[in-house]
From Swiss-Prot:
One of its GO terms (molecular function) is phosphoenolpyruvate carboxylase activity. The gene is ppc. InterPro entries: PEP_COase, PEP_COase_bac/pln-type, PEP_COase_Lys_AS, PEPCASE_His_AS, Pyrv/PenolPyrv_kinase-like_dom. GO terms for biological process: carbon fixation; oxaloacetate metabolic process; tricarboxylic acid cycle. Forms oxaloacetate, a four-carbon dicarboxylic acid source for the tricarboxylic acid cycle. This is Phosphoenolpyruvate carboxylase. It catalyses: oxaloacetate + phosphate = phosphoenolpyruvate + hydrogencarbonate. Its EC number is 4.1.1.31. Belongs to the PEPCase type 1 family. It comes from Pseudomonas putida (strain ATCC 47054 / DSM 6125 / CFBP 8728 / NCIMB 11950 / KT2440).
Length: 875
């Protein structure tokens, strides 16, 4: 075991000890002993037949349920914190830098060896367009208050690492840790009420304020340094290879709580927050830039001021204050922005650039390259709006709105027309100069809301908005329909209208739809920039299983690359990935490098889900590592794309997908007991009651199809069966081996990044799955006639593990990553009691009606949060 592992274990031990002290102070020695007994029972059950823990938990008194659940939940959160800090802790001089820190310098060296010139590398790096789209998440269960306390704990772990602390200073750090852990323990970890979409947006702003605001300039300094060392060239001031967007407050698909008024409020809050953050920067810069010497350009702006830089910054500060004040008052009353309000990012960037250039020209470059450069980088990356807000709505809502409009105008019912009739009507209206809607038209509520959203889009500054995403898009008319509704709302500038292809059938149809759209007269001429298309990972996996979904996503991207090239249109693919493998999640670096050749091309857009935002971007140091990985992967996929798959590999993949979807659907769709088994064996029904997000967990009444992808995955994750991530692979791979394709599969794993990444993700999820835990849920919750189905699914899980081990040639899953295995094992000691306790709580909850705020329901909520924290990927 390395020194690093030892230090991690020490941190976990210290945090656990301090938590124990806190619990003892509130609940006494006897209760703390109970926690220890449960922990030891969990360890014993891992080694033996597994009877001890269940009987210990079944004997718990009602009043002990909540504090026991809280104890194990808090421990897992502290263990997460220690592991996150471990990733960024200062290394000794003789230890190598982490992979994330070396990835860009190493890649630039490889690219030069491959024949790319210095100029070409610098140019490509400067024009990279990577957009990380932060999305709200029903399963992001940790409260902001607690996240801030955990961040402070990480800060104390860092302080504790300093070698030159005196005994008194070391004691001080220990006391601060003790106090923070006590604060966390005495803070309720679960919201009593559902967050609103505005609450979710504020959570996103907090991630920017506390982490990304600090990470971006530091990350870009290192990119600049790596580029300079490799090529002798600098990263231009206007370069922002990575920018941010958001769905929080803009994603109304299936969420009636996201209204036009909410979108307006979130856009204003973003402007207020941006002005406030930049004001803090400008105040700090004004204190520093006291120099007198300035170039003529700057002098022209401020005259003969004795402190010219401060004079420039004062002008900017006054405008930022005016912007912040206006945004604040506009939240409550609809008032136009005054002349002082900043509306264009250039108004923010220009004064900073002026100071930067002047300092360099006057021989004060060392000052220019300090905090002023950091502020400039932030201004270019975040701008006056922090990021762009996307709008998302279901295609059916636009269809219904147009049907009401055409019906009212006596033109017939839009919904009843075929695709050609719709396209003819939409194209004619898009060209028409007169409005489609008469002034006295009074639409129904749903149509009124769609039109109000379009008016908000038309009224907002262009730089504050990203894309208008159409979920469940299935035809070219779906895109034209949105363009027409936006035109009716008064939008005169081009806006990216983005079809989202989600189900297996839609992915297979994505090529023909885009072929039709790009072939329409005038459509391409209206594009400003690339054609954006979104690929959905969650619904396709729920519909067909991950084997068939992954291959359909790959083929759809290949087709889109080819079709856009034929039409001489640039393509931007937007990847709608979840945090889990069942929703397209996984390590971003590997995922980007496994995309089809030509599909990245300097541009990459992806969603970042709630709970993964915290793990990937919650601390500035970790955010920096993940930004490095994104940047390097997109640059590599652009300049060193993988070769296309060999025909033999494609044939194997076609067969794997066909076998996989059949095996998956035979269980999920064709077994009449499946839905009932799912509802009984997982906390799926209870998840709908929990205040876990602003969006309802169900679409409509019905079977699996009515479930949203998130609770579908979440339920299986809580019971550790992890079914959506692997079901179908066991049959597909077993059949391939039976056909004698073992050597071909090994070759694919070795030489084809797409296939290797799929198998690596499968191995990771199987290592976290646990048949013993899943069986414990069945024994406590499932009626006897459904238990054979549970046993069958666990057999399939075992088969999946065996076939993956056969493919990797390893004795155990993740044998190549002992540190990951060790951490899974460390977590299991604290996860096992939470799983068993959750099964016990579900049984008690289902046997009687409990109020939402009862200790029983609260304890159930805490187990959900704890298991999500322990597995670090929820839904």
């Amino acid at each position: 075991m390395t020194d690093i592992d030892v230090r991690l274990r020490e941190d976990v031990h210290v945090l656990g000890e301090l938590l124990g002290e806190t619990i003892r102070q509130q609940h006494g020695d006897a209760f703390l002993q109970k926690i220890e007994d449960i922990r030891h029972s969990a360890k014993a059950d891992r080694r033996g037949p597994g009877e001890q823990l269940s009987s210990t938990l079944a004997d718990l008194a009602e009043e002990d349920l909540l504090p026991v659940a809280r104890a194990f939940n808090q421990f897992l959160n502290l263990a997460n914190m220690a592991e996150q800090y471990q990733l960024i802790r200062r290394r000794d001089a003789d230890q190598p830098e982490p992979f994330e820190a070396q990835v860009l310098p190493e890649l630039l060296g490889r690219l030069k060896q491959a024949g790319h010139s210095n100029d070409a590398l610098a140019r490509q790096l400067a024009k990279l367009d990577i957009q990380l789209v932060l999305t709200a998440h029903p399963t992001e269960v940790a409260r902001r208050t607690l996240i801030q306390k955990y961040d402070a704990i990480a800060g104390q772990l860092a302080a504790q690492d300093h070698r030159d602390l005196t005994p008194a200073e070391r004691q001080q750090v220990r006391e601060r840790l003790r106090r923070l852990i006590a604060e966390a323990w005495h803070t309720e970890e679960i919201r009593r009420t559902r967050p609103t979409p505005v609450d979710e947006a504020k959570w996103g702003f907090a991630v920017i304020e506390h982490s990304l605001w600090h990470a971006i300039p530091s990350h870009l300094r290192k990119v600049d340094k790596a580029l300079l060392e490799a090529t002798g060239l600098r990263l231009p001031l206007e370069a922002a290879p990575i920018r941010f967007a958001s769905w929080m407050g803009g994603d109304r698909d299936g969420n009636p709580n996201v209204t036009a008024a909410v979108t307006r409020e979130v856009l204003l809050l973003a402007r207020w927050m941006a002005a406030d953050l930049f004001l803090r920067d400008i105040d700090a810069l004004a204190a520093e830039l006291s120099m007198q010497q300035a170039n003529d350009t700057l002098r022209k702006q401020v005259g003969d001021s004795a402190e010219p830089y401060r004079a420039v910054l004062k002008q900017l500060r006054d405008r930022l204050r005016a912007t912040r004040a206006w945004a604040h008052s506009a939240l409550t009353s609809n008032q136009p922005a005054g002349a002082d309000v900043l509306v264009d990012n250039r108004e923010l960037i220009a004064p900073l650039e002026l100071c930067y250039q002047s300092l360099h020209e006057c021989g004060m470059g060392v000052i220019a390259e300090g905090p002023l450069l950091d502020c400039l980088r932030r201004a270019v990356t975040f701008g006056l709006f922090l990021g762009r807000l996307d709008v998302r709505q279901d295609a059916a809502r636009h269809r219904d709105a147009l049907t009401e409009i055409t019906d009212y105008l006596g033109l017939g019912r839009y919904a009843d027309w075929d695709e050609e009739q719709r396209i003819a009507f939409l194209q004619a209206e898009l060209k028409n100069r007169r409005p489609l809607l008469p002034a006295h038209f009074k639409p129904q509520a749903d149509t009124a809301e769609v039109l109000a959203t379009c008016r908000e889009v038309a009224a907002a500054p262009a730089a504050s908005l990203g894309s208008y995403v159409i979920s469940m898009a299935g035809a070219a008319s779906d895109v034209l329909a949105v363009q027409l509704l936006l035109k009716e709302a008064g939008l005169t500038r081009p806006m990216r209208v983005v079809p989202l292809f989600e189900t297996l059938a839609d992915l297979d149809n994505a090529g023909p739809v885009m072929q039709r759209l790009l072939g329409l007269p005038g459509y391409r001429a209206g594009l400003r920039g690339p054609q954006e298309v979104m690929i959905g990972y969650s619904d396709s996996a729920k519909d067909a299983g991950t084997t068939a979904a992954a291959w359909a996503q790959y083929r759809a991207q290949e087709n889109l690359v080819r079709i856009c090239a034929e039409h001489q249109v640039e393509l931007l693919l937007f990847h709608g990935r979840g945090g889990t493998v069942g929703r397209g999640g996984g390590p971003a670096h590997a995922a980007i490098l496994s995309q089809p050749p030509g599909s990245v091309a300097g541009r990459f857009r992806t969603t970042e889900q709630g709970e993964m935002i915290r793990f990937k971007f919650g601390l500035p140091g970790i955010a920096e590592q993940n930004l490095n990985l994104y940047l390097a992967a997109v640059l590599e996929a652009t300049l060193l794309p993988p070769p296309p798959p060999q025909p033999a590999w494609r044939e194997v993949m076609d067969q794997l997908a066909a076998d996989g979807v059949q095996a998956y659907r035979s269980v999920v769709r064709e077994n009449p007991d499946f839905v009932e088994y799912f509802r009984q064996s997982t906390p799926e029904q209870e998840l709908g009651r929990l205040p876990l997000g602003s969006r309802p967990a169900k679409r409509r009444a019905g079977g699996i199809e009515s479930l949203r992808a998130i609770p579908w995955i979440f339920g299986w994750t809580q019971t550790r069966l992890m079914l959506p991530a692997w079901l179908g692979w066991e049959t597909a791979l077993t059949n391939a081996l039976a056909r004698g394709q073992g050597e071909l599969l090994a070759q694919m794993r070795e030489q084809w990044p797409f296939f290797r990444t799929r198998i690596d993700m499968l191995e990771m999820v199987l290592a976290k799955a646990d048949a013993q835990i899943a069986e414990a849920y069945d024994e406590r919750l499932v009626q006897p006639h459904l238990r054979p189905l549970g046993a069958h699914l666990r057999d399939l899980l075992s088969q999946s593990c065996q076939v993956v081990l056969g493919l990797t040639g390893q004795p155990v899953l993740l044998a190549h990553s002992p540190e990951t295995l060790e951490f899974i094992s460390l977590r299991n000691t604290y996860l096992d009691p939470l799983h068993r306790l959750q099964a016990e709580l579900l049984a008690r909850s289902r046997s009687r009606e409990a109020a939402l705020d009862s200790p029983l329901e609260q304890a159930l909520l805490v187990t959900v949060a704890g298991i999500a924290a322990g597995l670090r990927n929820t839904g």
